[in-house]
């Protein structure tokens, strides 16, 4: 259980293991349920299109406890695959991204921040973690550079 009291749905863990072990998904986006009591899957996709993933985050919404809908935070895992510049082959790194746009509501941002560790603890095998607060933070090239530690071709 997280500091916010939210629990992680078993579906979240099952889907993550399908991404990690079976390569069933390229990415998974997680969200808090509307009542903020459980972390659930927002979208699990086989799409290798970075823009599809990026748009899922950018277009995410959240409802405040008063019912107002605005931009929303999300958690995501993305299975990065890249070639090493040295020619030594292909590498995969599962990356956890905490998306909390600057213009999201204060309340959703606080609840997401206090629930993040519970999800991360449930997902064994994350290689890299990133915090993203605006669209520049989720540009493919900049994330790939971080994930690969500058070793990608």
Curated annotation (Swiss-Prot):
Query: Which cellular components does GO assign to this protein?
Result: actin cytoskeleton; cytoplasm; nuclear matrix
| Physiological role | Controls reversibly actin polymerization and depolymerization in a pH-sensitive manner. It has the ability to bind G- and F-actin in a 1:1 ratio of cofilin to actin. Binding to F-actin is regulated by tropomyosin. It is the major component of intranuclear and cytoplasmic actin rods. Required for accumulation of actin at the cell division site via depolymerizing actin at the cell ends. In association with myosin II has a role in the assembly of the contractile ring via severing actin filaments. Involved in the maintenance of the contractile ring once formed.
Q: Which UniProt keywords apply?
A: Actin-binding, Cell cycle, Cell division, Cytoplasm, Cytoskeleton, Nucleus
Offer one Pfam family short name for this entry: Cofilin_ADF
Q: Which GO terms describe its biological process?
A: actin filament depolymerization; cell division
What is the protein's major site of localization? cytoplasm
Q: Which family does it belong to?
A: Belongs to the actin-binding proteins ADF family.
Q: Where in the cell is it found?
A: Cytoplasm; Cytoplasm, Cytoskeleton; Nucleus matrix
Question: Which Gene Ontology molecular-function terms are recorded?
Answer: actin binding
**Domain ADF-H: from-to ranges:** 4-148
Presence of the UniProt keyword Cell cycle in the record:
yes
The molecule here is called Cofilin
- The organism named in the record is Gibberella zeae (strain ATCC MYA-4620 / CBS 123657 / FGSC 9075 / NRRL 31084 / PH-1) (Wheat head blight fungus)
Gene this protein is translated from: COF1
Give the source's domain of life in one word. Eukaryota
